[in-house]
From Swiss-Prot:
Keyword Transmembrane among record annotations: yes
Protein's recorded name: 11-beta-hydroxysteroid dehydrogenase 1
Binding site for substrate: 166
Organism listed in the record: Rattus norvegicus (Rat)
A biological-process GO annotation: cellular response to estradiol stimulus
Spans traversing the lipid bilayer: 5-20
Lumenal face of the membrane: 21-288
Cysteine-cysteine disulfides: none
UniProt subcellular location: Endoplasmic reticulum membrane
């Protein structure tokens, strides 16, 4: 085990002390970005931040009226260009088609921000299998479809993917079983794909964004009278997601508590993943 000690220490230090590179707004100047779930909440705020930084944006959500308003505001804020394509991520054919159409509008892709979710109601789980299926399809499977469709463009640009997840995807909480299951699935799938990118030398970063209780209109409405803690601001949350994605971090934590990254970051898991990766014949996967 002694031969693993130094690599493990380096891993731990790397986890707790993120990259020294500082974020600069000009890093987004002219970048081509897709944002899903962009008609309101965190998605809308990300679109506004990106626009102020001079990015090209293509937005999607179910509400065409909401998207029209956001795109108009994006152009006012200084977006290099702003377009929208309305549709539902319950339709996997639309999800795949959306990426193709967005790529044509942008002329490529530098960053894919996956932020949409299906409607979630806080309640005890009894026998609503339909709710579980819908959550897994919209909150998880559509993310797989979108990222798979976008990967060829992202490989060309050495781009980035942001996966908007939740503390409910790192720890169990009552009343949101279906939602939590879909968020755990995001971690399992995309953290695995990140390892595969490392093994096969694919220079596309994947940033898992682990969010706490954020003051979006939807979250405040659904949790009214149930969650007693104070929500964190969506504007700052959106900016932290963008920063972490641009800096190609593996994970971004945003919550009112500064203890969240330490308690949920799970360095033990990272050590085990690092050690297990050493047992693979990487040359086999690179050649395939």
């Amino acid at each position: 085990m002694k031969k693993y000690l130094l690599p493990v220490l380096v891993l731990c230090l790397g986890y707790y002390y993120s990259t020294n590179e500082e974020f600069r707004p000009e890093m987004l100047q002219g970048k081509k970005v897709i944002v899903t779930g962009a008609s309101k909440g965190i998605g809308r705020e990300m679109a506004y931040h990106l626009s102020k930084m001079g990015a090209h944006v293509v937005l999607t959500a179910r509400s065409e009226e909401g998207l029209q308003k956001v795109v108009s505001r994006c152009l006012e804020l200084g977006a290099a260009s702003a377009h929208y394509i309305a549709g539902t991520m319950e339709d996997m054919a639309f999800a795949e088609r959306f990426v193709v159409e967005a790529g044509k509008l942008l002329g490529g892709l530098d960053m894919l921000i996956l932020n949409h979710i299906t409607q979630t109601t806080m309640s005890l789980f009894h026998d609503d299998i339909h709710s579980v299926r819908r959550s897994m399809e919209v909150n998880f499977l559509s993310y797989v479809v979108l990222s798979t469709a976008a990967l060829p463009m992202l490989k060309q640009s050495n781009g980035s993917i942001a996966i908007i997840s939740s503390m409910a995807g790192k720890m169990t909480q009552p009343l949101i079983a279906s939602y939590s299951a879909s968020k755990f699935a995001l971690d399992g799938f995309f953290s695995t794909i990140r390892k595969e990118h490392l093994m096969t030398k694919v220079n596309v970063s994947i940033t898992l964004c682990v969010l706490g209780f954020i003051d979006t209109e939807t979250a405040l409405k659904e949790t009214s009278g149930i969650i007693l803690s104070q929500a964190a601001p969506k504007e700052e949350c959106a900016l932290e997601i963008i920063k972490g994605t641009v800096l190609r971090k593996d994970e971004v934590y945003y919550d009112k508590s500064s203890w969240t990254p330490l308690l949920l970051g799970n360095p033990g898991r990272r050590i085990m993943e690092f050690l297990s990766l050493r047992s693979y014949n990487r040359d086999l996967f690179v050649s395939n």
